[in-house]
A protein has these predicted regions:
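Perimembrane helix-loop-helix junctions
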Residues: 3, 251-260, 264-268, 285-311, ...
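Start-transfer (signal-anchor) and selected internal transmembrane alpha helices
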Residues: 2-35, 54, 58-130, 307
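Hydrophobic, aromatic-rich transmembrane alpha-helices
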Residues: 80-86, 359-385, 398-403, 425-426
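Transmembrane-helix motifs of polytopic, lipid-linked glycan transferases
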Residues: 79-87, 190-213
């Protein structure tokens, strides 16, 4: 066959691929510039008037290059996932793939946390004066404490106001650690291990959702990126990683319910977890946006929806019956937020710097994937990639609403973890996954070794 008889499609395909890669790189470069701008402008503001209350804008962190006992393990996990992750994700049986993602994600998070050492990285993270373990002894009588919970939210309303994180969350967050203590798993070490091990299952919830609503091929392509997410820098050790897992499984069960997988059971279980989610964190009420995206994508909504709603009311009814009123507590939290750094931090800076923080949380690969997801949505082709784009868009909208609320000024590298994880599946749309995975790993390793993060 002569060359003039060869089809032109391969050349066109190569041209399109090169064009798309350039656009991916432009998107990544724009994200780098956004973060650089936030760093420069934030440093100027902090040096001028100190209103940001962060030492290394836009992150709550200190510049402190260091290595630690977790360094060799973190590098080893990164190399292994980059080298073998995509191939294993393509061929492992589905359940084994989920187990592998959880194992790799857990190892990645533990090793990154241990770069700061066992004490600072894990055992002491949840024992500071702001954290949940400081108030375990005040929950000896749980019903009485719940009835009186709102009396201690605002500073000045009580001589024993709650520390920041207890005041800033509904009581289910603190009760988690109270019950861990009661079953013999008390102290910062067990709390840290709990948050990392449970938090690592969030990736599985995301993958189950993508498989149910988009397709298995995209879920498999996303798997290595969820296992090796830069977000692990803040997942270990943070209670928000645990919150992210509860919320992710609520979404996953809803996705299974609306696609016909035991709709009554999965619908009820999803509702129960959604009810728990909003009593772990006020901000996670915005998961209603992600849930709405799931309902839009689901084809069998009618049967599971009543069960999901019935499950959802259980946790709120229990807490309300015990004397804790969510809406009253949130109103008092707004006052408490304004009493602290949140009342001083300038929204004009944080409204865009918060987004710059997410560049480090989700990585440049996710930025490129989001560009591709946006292109797919604009084409409006009803493909698996389009459905994935809708799911990712739901998470992005929830994040933007949180940003505009003014209740998320700074520290969003931790606070928005439950939303950020849902952006990572966009990486499934990228070709050449190993190069992008390597970029994700290098970013996480640099952040963890150059900075001492606040979380």
């Amino acid at each position: 066959m002569t060359s003039d008889l060869l089809p032109e499609a391969p050349a066109d395909t190569r041209t399109t691929a090169r064009r798309d890669l350039r656009r991916d790189l432009y998107a990544a470069a724009a994200a780098v510039l956004l973060f650089a701008a936030a760093a420069v402008v934030g440093t100027v503001i902090e040096h001028r008037d100190g209103t940001l209350f962060v030492n290394w804008p836009p992150l709550l962190a200190y510049w402190a290059p260091h290595i630690g006992p977790g360094t060799p393990a973190a590098i080893a996990v990164a190399v292994a996932v980059v080298a073998y992750g995509p191939a294993l994700a393509a061929r492992l049986p589905w359940r084994r793939l989920l187990l592998a993602v959880w194992a790799a994600g857990t190892a990645w998070t533990f090793s990154l946390a241990l770069v700061d050492g066992w004490q600072r990285g894990i055992a002491r993270r949840l024992t500071t004066r702001y954290e949940y373990l400081q108030v375990i002894d005040r929950f000896q009588d749980i019903p009485a404490t719940l009835r009186d919970f709102t009396s201690h939210i605002v500073v000045g309303a009580s001589p024993e106001h709650w520390p920041a994180h207890i005041a800033g969350h509904p009581p289910a967050a603190t009760l988690t650690f109270v019950y861990l203590d009661r079953v013999g798993l008390g102290g910062g070490a067990w709390a840290g291990v709990w948050c990392i091990t449970v938090g690592a299952t969030a990736a599985l919830g995301v993958l189950v959702t993508v498989r149910a609503l988009a397709d298995e091929k995209l879920a498999r392509r996303a798997a290595p990126f969820l296992a090796l997410a830069p977000a692990a820098v803040w997942m270990g050790t943070s209670a928000d990683g645990y919150f992210a897992a509860v919320a992710a499984w609520a979404v996953a069960l809803l996705a299974l319910a609306v696609t016909g997988h035991r709709p009554r059971r999965t619908g009820l279980a999803s509702g129960l977890l959604f009810g728990l989610t909003v009593f772990l964190s006020y901000g996670l009420t915005l998961y209603v946006v992600i849930a709405a995206a799931v309902l839009v994508l689901g084809s069998r909504r009618a049967r599971p929806l009543p069960f999901a709603l019935a499950g959802f009311v259980v946790v709120p009814v229990v807490f309300t019956a015990m004397g804790f009123y969510w809406w009253e507590a949130y109103d008092l939290l707004v006052t408490r937020y304004d009493q602290g750094a949140g009342g001083t931090r300038p929204q004009a800076y944080w409204v865009w710097a918060n987004l710059a923080c997410q560049v480090l949380v989700v990585g440049l690969a996710t930025v490129a994937g989001l560009r591709r997801a946006g292109a797919v949505l604009l084409r409006r082709d009803r493909t698996a990639a389009f459905r994935l784009g809708v799911l990712v868009l739901g998470a992005l909208v929830a994040m933007l609403v949180a940003d505009l609320s003014g209740m998320s000024k700074a520290e969003t590298e931790r606070i928005w973890l439950p939303f950020a994880l849902w952006l990572l599946p966009a990486c499934a749309l990228l070709p050449g996954p190993r190069a992008w995975l390597a970029a994700q790993a290098v970013l996480a390793l640099l952040v963890n070794h150059l900075l001492l993060t606040g979380w």
